[in-house]
A protein has these predicted regions:
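Mono-ADP-ribosyltransferase
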Residues: 108-315
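Beta-loop motif signature
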Residues: 17-95
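A generic structural signal for short, solvent-exposed coil/turn residues
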Residues: 7, 37-38, 44, 60, ...
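A short macromolecule-binding patch
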Residues: 92-104
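Generic detector of short, well-ordered, non-transmembrane alpha-helical segments enriched
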Residues: 9-11, 67, 186, 268
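Sec-dependent N-terminal signal peptides of Gram-positive bacterial secreted proteins and lipoproteins
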Residues: 1-15
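Structured surface patches comprising rigid loops and adjacent beta-strands/short helices at the edges
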Residues: 50, 101-109
Length: 315
């Protein structure tokens, strides 16, 4: 039944089937296949200020340096042979520039695979952290994972002063609780959202590489893409979280244990580093037995098409 619950969490269509015949349905197998295609020209985002150079006949003019600030999108117009560098353009400058990557000057949009070993390590770290929480901190975090997330996030997005005394206390306890959790290694998490919600968090900048994302509320994310997809309205945020104090892995104490939730700090500022279109196909095989009849094996297929928006925490 745990696996059936997993399908319920991943697919609304399967959820109805599993719920209707819960006592007679067994999951035999589930497989998912995902691929993604990049949108637009190759682009990078600077994580610190860099020096580029004006060009003459697509060759660098080292007599004319151009300073480019951090958190700027670089659109690649040409990659030079032999990894010699790139011909790029930047917002607000129509001229082509020469840039040579220095390894640590750009955000990396590469994700980190959350394998079973890494999830186990994170779970152990979370359990150790949770034992140090006060009763009020634990209660507030659990309340958030249940019925409290809307009221708490509304308070954070609006005015905490207008929120009830209980909600203000919950916010204080959640903050003090999750700020104690230290992520010991970089992590990639996922969040399902809508295009409307994404644009709102981008403050109407437009969905583009270099767009700056911010939400004063906590962001519930998950280690599992398919869990995020079940909450998505055609948009998945893929967030690369560096080591440090950026939130907490709360799954072991969550009321929705199994969703693999990493709760990000409210007000976390991020920047779009990659845009893709994602395609996922889910194959499920279940066995159903109705009263007085033979067991029937059913094969189900569901396809998803969605945007993948890769975000990195801003420097």
């Amino acid at each position: 039944m745990a696996l059936l619950a997993g399908i319920s969490m991943q697919s609304p269509t399967y959820a109805k089937t599993a719920h209707k015949h819960a006592s007679e349905t067994n999951l035999l197998m589930i497989n998912t296949y995902t691929h993604a295609t990049n949108v637009g020209k190759q682009a990078f985002v600077t994580r610190r200020s860099i020096t580029a150079y004006e060009t003459k006949n697509d060759q660098p003019d080292y007599q004319n340096p151009v300073q480019i600030p951090k958190n700027t999108a670089l659109t690649v117009q040409q990659k030079l042979a032999g990894n010699a560098g790139y011909i790029i353009t930047v917002p607000g400058n129509p001229n082509k520039l020469f840039f040579q990557d220095t390894h640590d000057s750009l955000y990396s949009y590469k994700s980190i695979r959350n394998n079973a070993h890494e999830i186990d390590k994170l779970t152990r770290s979370s359990l150790k952290w949770s034992k140090k929480l006060t009763g009020n901190q634990r209660h507030a975090i659990r309340y958030y994972t249940g019925d409290g997330y809307e009221a708490i996030n509304d308070a954070l997005r609006g005015s905490e002063k207008k929120a009830s005394k209980e909600i203000r206390s919950d916010v204080k306890n959640i903050n003090s609780g999750i700020h104690q959790f230290k992520l010991s290694a970089p992590l990639t998490v996922f969040r399902g959202t809508s295009m409307f919600g994404l644009k709102k968090s981008l403050d109407d900048q437009g969905v583009k590489v270099g767009g700056e994302y911010s939400d004063m509320a906590y962001s519930s994310t998950t280690l599992k893409r398919m869990v995020a997809l079940s909450f998505s309205k055609h948009v998945i945020l893929k967030i690369n979280v560096p080591r440090g104090y950026h939130g907490a892995y709360i799954d072991p104490i969550s009321k929705n244990k199994g969703e693999k939730e990493y709760l990000m700090n409210g007000g976390t500022k991020m920047i779009i580093t990659r845009l893709q279109k994602g395609y996922t196909t889910m194959y499920a095989t279940i066995a159903q037995k109705h009263s007085g009849s033979k067991t029937k094996v059913k094969h189900m297929t569901k396809q998803y098409k969605y945007w993948i928006v890769t975000l990195d925490l801003m420097k």
